[in-house]
């Protein structure tokens, strides 16, 4: 955790409700020489279902490999999250650590191994110490119950604030609660999933439908953000549903009120995703990039991400420089259909370039005023079709360099 809270942090912290069927514990296992909780244990009542998405990195952590296999079974009794050590790229020692953790928890709960999920976050290349993890679990088994804010803080690494969200809906006459927490600040460029994010609900829903809902929500949220274009080896998003709300189980998208659950999952994912961008390492500006007029939505998304990932665009925003030429560059390099003489660009709704050149009588003053704010809007019209997309990123500052240059020290 970093001492100074991001200037883009939300002005309020939502009060998250307890969710029936879930017990929360967190302790200091001591993965680093610090006095903070770094092992979190989520316990679920029997028959809790799970869905999940994991990184598309070619170098996934042992935890990711374990979760990928376990998700297919659709059941969960526990989730363990370790902070301070990602356990990625650690060979057989890393796999042994995951095996030891899942075995210890499964033995304690008298459940199947595949019902125990594990995530780890932190430095890459250092095996997770098995004794430290297992000793931490023993402490967690007998620890006092805590609330969601404790858990959100315990999973953090370079984050500057705890990221939480909630939704309350009614499904077929039953009140349903949904809570989400996430950690992430750097190494953020998701592909299918991102960072470590967890969603919890007391809704009764089939795991297959929950998986569909999470996948849809991901496409509109986690897959639309970037901080530094680096996709983590540990990215994981998991959703757990205890069925404690007592609603008739949802098994199809056509079921009554299934659309309400989908909307809630999407809303929480989008809120959490944008909070991650707002906590981008060293960030001082939250940037929304909209692309319209592309040949397809997919093409628009690729172009938008090219702009959002451009170090030149991001540093221009940090310097409050209306250098729209860098946006032109990012569009041109995206590898998607674009026509120079049809392209138009706006900053804060103000057109700065159109038809292949700067607009006549361009006045930079109102654009400069917009760039001095913390919320920046970049809009591009490709002029070729109806494809559209919106993504979110942050600026690139000296703070990002300082945080990552000193990360291991």
Curated annotation (Swiss-Prot):
Quaternary data: Heterotetramer of two alpha and two beta chains.
GO CC terms of this entry: cytoplasm
Reaction(s) the record says it catalyses: N(2)-acetyl-L-ornithine + L-glutamate = N-acetyl-L-glutamate + L-ornithine; L-glutamate + acetyl-CoA = N-acetyl-L-glutamate + CoA + H(+)
Location in the cell: Cytoplasm
Active site feature: 194
Annotated NCBIfam families: ArgJ, PRK05388.1
Enzyme class at the top of the EC tree: transferase
CDD domains for this protein: OAT
A molecular function GO annotation: glutamate N-acetyltransferase activity
Pathway terms, separated by semicolons: Amino-acid biosynthesis; L-arginine biosynthesis; L-ornithine and N-acetyl-L-glutamate from L-glutamate and N(2)-acetyl-L-ornithine (cyclic): step 1/1; Amino-acid biosynthesis; L-arginine biosynthesis; N(2)-acetyl-L-ornithine from L-glutamate: step 1/4
Residues the UniProt record annotates as site (Involved in the stabilization of negative charge on the oxyanion by the formation of the oxyanion hole): 121-122
PANTHER family (UniProt xref): ARGININE BIOSYNTHESIS BIFUNCTIONAL PROTEIN ARGJ, ARGININE BIOSYNTHESIS BIFUNCTIONAL PROTEIN ARGJ, MITOCHONDRIAL
Main location per the UniProt record: cytoplasm
Disulfide bonds: none
Site (Cleavage): 193-194
Enzyme Commission (EC) number: 2.3.1.35, 2.3.1.1
Record's keyword terms, sorted: Acyltransferase, Amino-acid biosynthesis, Arginine biosynthesis, Autocatalytic cleavage, Cytoplasm, Multifunctional enzyme, Transferase
Residues noted as binding substrate in the record, renumbered to the chain: 157, 183, 194, 281, 404, 409
Function: Catalyzes two activities which are involved in the cyclic version of arginine biosynthesis: the synthesis of N-acetylglutamate from glutamate and acetyl-CoA as the acetyl donor, and of ornithine by transacetylation between N(2)-acetylornithine and glutamate.
GO biological process: L-arginine biosynthetic process; ornithine biosynthetic process
Protein name as it appears in the record: Arginine biosynthesis bifunctional protein ArgJ
Name of the coding gene: argJ
Family per similarity comment: Belongs to the ArgJ family.
């Amino acid at each position: 955790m970093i001492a100074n809270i991001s200037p883009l942090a939300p002005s309020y912290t939502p009060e998250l409700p307890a969710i029936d069927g879930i017990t929360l514990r967190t302790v200091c296992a001591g993965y680093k020489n610090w006095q903070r909780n770094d092992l979190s244990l989520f316990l679920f009542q029997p028959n809790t279902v799970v869905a999940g998405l994991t990184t598309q990195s070619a170098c996934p952590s042992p935890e990711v490999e374990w979760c990928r296999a376990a998700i297919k079974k659709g059941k969960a009794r526990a989730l363990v999250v370790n902070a301070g050590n990602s356990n990625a790229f650690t060979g057989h020692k890393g796999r042994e650590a995951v095996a030891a953790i899942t075995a210890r928890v499964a033995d304690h709960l008298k459940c199947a191994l595949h019902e125990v999920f594990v995530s780890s976050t932190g430095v890459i290349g250092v095996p997770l110490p098995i004794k430290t993890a297992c000793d931490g679990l023993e402490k967690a088994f007998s620890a006092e119950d805590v609330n969601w804010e404790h858990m959100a803080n315990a999973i953090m690494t370079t984050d500057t604030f705890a990221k939480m969200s909630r939704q309350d809906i009614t499904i077929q006459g039953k009140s349903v609660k949904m809570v989400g927490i996430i950690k992430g600040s750097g190494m953020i460029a998701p592909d299918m999933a991102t960072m470590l994010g967890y969603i919890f609900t007391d809704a009764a829903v089939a795991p297959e439908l929950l998986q569909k809902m999470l996948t849809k929500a991901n496409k509109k949220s986690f897959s639309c953000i970037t901080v530094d274009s680096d996709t983590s080896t540990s990215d994981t998003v998991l959703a757990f549903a205890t069925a404690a709300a007592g609603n008739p189980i949802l098994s199809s998208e056509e079921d009554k009120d299934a659309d309400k659950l989908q909307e809630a999952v999407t809303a929480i994912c989008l809120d959490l995703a944008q909070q991650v961008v707002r906590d981008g390492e060293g960030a001082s500006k939250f940037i929304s990039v909209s692309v319209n007029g592309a040949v397809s939505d997919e093409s628009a998304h690729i172009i938008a991400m090219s702009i959002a990932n451009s170090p030149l665009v991001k540093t221009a925003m940090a310097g409050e420089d209306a250098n729209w030429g860098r946006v032109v560059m990012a569009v041109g390099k995206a590898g998607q259909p674009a026509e120079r003489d049809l392209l138009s660009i706006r900053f804060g709704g103000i057109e700065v370039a159109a038809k292949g050149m700067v607009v006549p009588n361009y006045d930079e003053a109102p654009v400069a005023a917009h760039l001095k704010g913390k919320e920046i809007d970049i809009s591009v019209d490709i002029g070729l079709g109806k494809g559209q997309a919106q993504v979110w990123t942050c600026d690139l500052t000296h703070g990002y360099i300082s945080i990552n240059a000193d990360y291991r020290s």
